[in-house]
Amino acid sequence: MADYSAGTESQEVVVNVTKNTSETIQRSDSLVSVPFLQKLVAEAVGTYFLIFAGCASLVVNENYYNMITFPGIAIVWGLVLTVLVYTVGHISGGHFNPAVTIAFASTRRFPLIQVPAYVVAQLLGSILASGTLRLLFMGNHDQFSGTVPNGTNLQAFVFEFIMTFFLMFVICGVATDNRAVGEFAGIAIGSTLLLNVIIGGPVTGASMNPARSLGPAFVHGEYEGIWIYLLAPVVGAIAGAWVYNIVRYTDKPLSETTKSASFLKGRAASK
């Protein structure tokens, strides 16, 4: 399910659920190489559709008599993430979230030098998606699709921390551990997002993603509580990644429990 390419200083986690077993996604340290630029485009496009679909469900629900409903909004977020993981996860890793990228880098599973470029691509995708929605729903139909705390700042911070911790813990489990059932990675990750939106949506808007909050905030010029959505998800994701590293413990070498090729390739080789 994940490509885990070893390097001298850091490794890159790439979600891979395709049937192409002849090629393995290789790490590229060059910031101007074609493969790396392809990854950036995949991250920008993936983040665009994640934010467009998720935030569109909020705006449409607000403008059209709650036809989507709150559970429907949660399902939209979960489904779009699931689809995107299977679509471009094997190209860029399917982060779509600066918190995920930073967390992987903190555990040396993603090249630190590539983090700024990934974050910029993710923010660009979010801003473009938010701008598209504002153009589509101008005038009386214009709705702020960002995230604002509905309780205290402390309550919102703790919720965002816990939800992002949970999301990152699941991502690490299905994307970096060779013992996981890789074909269900997208479903597991999307389902986790869906659950978090249902639980935390009424309290914080269930961001779990600095890009998800910053894009709409930038387009609408509304920054209430934005620091919560920039800080809490990053701290939560880093904590989730490190805790999974602790519970991953096995008597096998790390190289045998982290994925070195696609799940399907490893499975075929074992037959």
Curated annotation (Swiss-Prot):
GO terms for cellular component: peribacteroid membrane. Coiled coil: none annotated. It comes from Glycine max (Soybean). A motif (NPA 2) lies at residues 209-211. Induction: During nodulation in legume roots after Rhizobium infection. Aquaporins contain two tandem repeats each containing three membrane-spanning domains and a pore-forming loop with the signature motif Asn-Pro-Ala (NPA). GO terms for biological process: nodulation. Keywords: Membrane, Nodulation, Phosphoprotein, Repeat, Transmembrane, Transmembrane helix, Transport. The chain crosses the membrane at residues 40-62, 72-94, 115-137, 152-174, 181-203, 225-247. This is Nodulin-26. The keyword Transmembrane applies. It is found in: Symbiosome, Peribacteroid membrane. Belongs to the MIP/aquaporin (TC 1.A.8) family. NIP (TC 1.A.8.12) subfamily. GO terms for molecular function: channel activity. The keyword Membrane applies. It holds the Pfam family MIP. It is a multi-pass membrane protein. It comes from the Eukaryota. A motif (NPA 1) lies at residues 97-99. Aquaporins facilitate the transport of water and small neutral solutes across cell membranes. This aquaporin may function in transporting small molecules across the peribacteroid membranes. Gene3D superfamilies: Glycerol uptake facilitator protein. The modification Phosphoserine is found at residue 262. InterPro entries: Aquaporin-like, Aquaporin_transptr, MIP, MIP_CS.
